[in-house]
Curated annotation (Swiss-Prot):
Motif Nuclear export signal, residue numbers: 240-255
Residue stretches of biased makeup (Pro residues): 47-75
Compartments reported by the entry: Cytoplasm; Nucleus; Secreted
Main location per the UniProt record: cytoplasm
GO BP, sorted A to Z: cell differentiation; extracellular matrix organization; innate immune response; mRNA processing; negative regulation of endocytosis; negative regulation of immunological synapse formation; negative regulation of T cell activation via T cell receptor contact with antigen bound to MHC molecule on antigen presenting cell; negative regulation of T cell receptor signaling pathway
PROSITE patterns: GALECTIN
Protein name as catalogued: Galectin-3
Domain Galectin residue range list: 132-262
Task of the protein: Galactose-specific lectin which binds IgE. May mediate with the alpha-3, beta-1 integrin the stimulation by CSPG4 of endothelial cells migration. Together with DMBT1, required for terminal differentiation of columnar epithelial cells during early embryogenesis. In the nucleus: acts as a pre-mRNA splicing factor. Involved in acute inflammatory responses including neutrophil activation and adhesion, chemoattraction of monocytes macrophages, opsonization of apoptotic neutrophils, and activation of mast cells.
Gene symbol of the encoding locus: Lgals3
GO cellular component: cell surface; collagen-containing extracellular matrix; cornified envelope; cytoplasm; external side of plasma membrane; extracellular matrix; extracellular region; extracellular space
């Protein structure tokens, strides 16, 4: 069920010759638009920081808005975790941060940069109670990114994500740690209390006792799933009215740290 895309195809059509840099990337990645020894514009009263361009935002900055977050793989400028956007330098604070202070509200630990509370990489609020239901007001839509972070319990048996429409399940994502002594990921859809044909994935990036990050990107005709920053699989929509998918159920043998959604 894994598609044949490279990560560079995970989000097509960026048109960005250097689709790198992710402000607020997880791990120890730097934020966008930083400068050596200086904070973002505004840190030096009455002057721009070294290398700034008078009267405009420096390369890699997004004037007047928060930069986009991203599913792993190139997309809009500054989207992919890794090297920073043009003009950025390692180890510098993100927009709104000052030397010696943490990033803006919503920054994930050890990450520079931050997003509003609605962003996918907010400060973990957990552990959250499992099973956990994440409301999806207005349903899902293309370019919505759902991010789930937590830790697999020791001797885990399963993880379950269910994108629900009432009693139906539009997308069932079910890593199984021991199905007949094998590890497998099962995806399916349930309509009118009937499960459809299973799609099985042998690649299995989860480990008992280890932390994980699952990202689900909604596209017009499929879901894309990435685990720990690597594209894993895609699942074609069997329910076409995405706006009716109003809840994500999270269950299984995990400690849940955070669950968020945002548009990218």
């Amino acid at each position: 069920m894994a598609d044949s895309f490279s990560l560079n195809d995970a989000l097509a059509g960026s048109g960005n010759p250097n689709p790198q840099g992710y402000p607020g990337a997880w791990g120890n990645q730097p934020g966008a638009g930083g400068y050596p020894g200086a904070a973002y514009p505004g840190a030096y009263p009455g002057q721009a920081p070294p290398g700034a361009y008078p009267g405009q935002a420096p390369p890699g900055a997004y004037p007047g808005q928060a930069p986009p977050s991203a599913y792993p793989g190139p997309t809009a400028p500054g989207a992919y975790p890794g090297p920073t956007a043009p003009g950025a330098y390692p180890g510098q604070p993100a927009p709104g941060a000052f030397p010696g202070q943490p990033g803006a509200p919503g920054a994930y630990p050890q990450c520079s940069g931050g997003y509003p509370a609605a962003g996918p990489y907010g400060v973990p609020a957990g552990p959250l109670t499992v099973p956990y239901d994440l409301p999806l007001p207005g349903g899902v839509m293309p370019r919505m990114l759902i991010t789930i972070m937590g830790t697999v319990k020791p001797n885990a048996n399963r993880i379950v994500l269910d994108f629900r429409r009432g009693n139906d399940v539009a997308f069932h994502f079910n890593p199984r740690f021991n199905e007949n002594n094998r590890r497998v990921i099962v995806c399916n859809t349930k309509q009118d209390n009937n499960w459809g044909k299973e799609e099985r994935q042998s690649a299995f990036p989860f480990e008992s006792g280890k932390p994980f990050k699952i990202q689900v990107l909604v596209e017009a005709d499929h879901f894309k799933v990435a685990v720990n920053d690597a594209h894993l699989l895609q699942y074609n929509h069997r329910m076409k009215n995405l706006r009716e998918i109003s809840q994500l159920g999270i269950s299984g043998d995990i400690t849940l740290t955070s669950a968020n959604h945002a548009m990218i």
